[in-house]
C-alpha cells in the first residue's frame, strides 16, 4: 500500500495504532526502528504522536488530512499507545508484562485524560458527566433491546453475499452449514 500510495501520490492517511505488542513480544523485538520511520523510506512524510492524547491526535490528524487533501500525497501517522488487555481470550499478559508497566500506562488512559482536560478548563462538570452516564445507560439498554428483538440469522444465509455469483466452494460450504443446522 505504501508503494502504491507513494507512486500515485494518493491522498491517503495511514494510521498505525502501535500498541507496542506483537501478541506477546514487544514490537522492538520485530523492529528496532519505530514504525513511523519506515514510511519515510517510501517517500511518505510520517509522524509519531501520543495515541493516548486525544487533543494531540486530533491536531496531527487534522494536519495529515489537510496535507493529503491538498494533493501533496500520502501521510503516515503512528499513534503510540499501549494494549491494556490481553491479545486474545486465551492470552495471559501477566506472563510477559509486569503489573507496574500496566499501572504506569493505565494512568495515561485517553478517556480519563480528556475528561480531566475538559474539567480543568471548565468545559464540562460533574453534572454534565452524570447526564452523560444516564444517556449512555439509556443508549445501552436501547441497543440491547434491539439486539434481542432481531431473529437469529440462518448461518447459511451469511454466505449469500460473499461473491456476486457464489463459487462452488461457497455453495458447498453453505450446504454443509445448512446440514449442520438441520442436525442441531
Where is each model-derived feature located?
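C-terminal intrinsically disordered, low-complexity extensions immediately downstream
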Residues: 142, 148-184
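Glycine-rich ThDP/TPP pyrophosphate-binding loop and its adjacent helix/strand module
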Residues: 1-149
Amino acid at each position: 500500500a505504501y508503494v502504491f500510495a507513494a507512486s500515485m501520490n494518493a491522498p491517503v492517511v495511514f494510521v498505525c495504532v502501535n500498541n507496542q505488542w506483537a501478541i506477546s513480544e514487544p514490537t522492538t523485538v520485530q523492529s528496532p526502528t519505530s514504525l513511523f520511520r519506515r514510511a519515510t523510506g517510501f517517500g511518505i512524510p510520517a509522524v509519531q504522536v501520543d495515541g493516548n492524547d486525544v487533543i494531540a491526535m486530533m491536531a496531527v490528524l487534522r494536519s495529515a488530512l489537510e496535507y493529503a487533501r491538498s494533493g501533496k500525497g500520502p501521510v503516515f501517522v503512528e499513534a503510540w499507545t499501549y494494549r491494556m488487555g490481553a491479545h486474545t481470550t486465551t492470552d495471559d499478559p501477566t506472563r510477559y508484562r509486569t503489573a507496574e508497566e500496566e499501572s504506569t500506562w493505565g494512568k495515561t488512559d485517553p478517556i480519563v485524560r480528556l475528561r480531566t482536560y475538559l474539567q480543568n478548563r471548565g468545559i464540562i462538570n460533574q453534572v454534565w458527566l452524570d447526564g452523560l452516564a444516564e444517556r449512555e445507560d439509556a443508549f445501552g439498554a436501547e441497543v440491547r433491546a434491539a439486539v434481542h428483538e432481531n431473529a437469529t440469522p440462518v448461518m447459511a444465509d451469511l454466505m449469500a453475499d460473499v461473491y456476486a455469483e457464489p463459487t462452488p466452494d461457497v455453495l458447498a460450504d453453505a450446504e454443509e452449514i445448512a446440514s449442520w443446522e438441520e442436525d442441531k
